[in-house]
Amino acid sequence: MTLIYVPTTLNLIDSFNYSESIYKWGDYFFRHLESRDFYFSNFGFISLFLLLFVIPTITLTTLGCFLFSYLRFTDINKIKIQIYSLLTVFIFIDVFGLVVSVLFGYLLPLAFDSLPFSVNLTREVFLSLAMIVIFANSVIFTLRQKRNID
């Protein structure tokens, strides 16, 4: 999920030319992200883990908690199941995104010298399908839990 959000956000910022420094940072980061050694270097792993897993998960979960409690005008204790399912979905999508990114960005090009398909396109298709399936499952799970609470 966040593997799709971060590049899309940087591309949108770049398309509107808001800041030259943000563009240079994004270009530098994704140039190093495409190199195969970046995944297994200490800096690369820590920055990927922080940027694509820890920070978005904490931010989205916190925003989701406040949004749920504000929209439903209830205290946080009544919606713990929805918050836990939301957190589980974010963590699963982030872990899946990192695994797919390493698989299609590093291991698959090592196995084949020339691939008959675009690695980036295939990765985005798999991530999009996984996001749709996981989001649908989380919605169904949340609705079932809500029915059990009511």
UniProtKB/Swiss-Prot annotation:
Compartments, as annotated in UniProt: Cell membrane
Main location: membrane
Gene Ontology CC: plasma membrane
Membrane topology annotation: Multi-pass membrane protein
Transmembrane segments: 48-68, 89-109, 123-143
Keywords of the record: Cell membrane, Membrane, Transmembrane, Transmembrane helix
Family, similarity comment: To M.pneumoniae MPN_085 central region.
Protein name: Uncharacterized protein MPN_087
Source species: Mycoplasma pneumoniae (strain ATCC 29342 / M129 / Subtype 1)
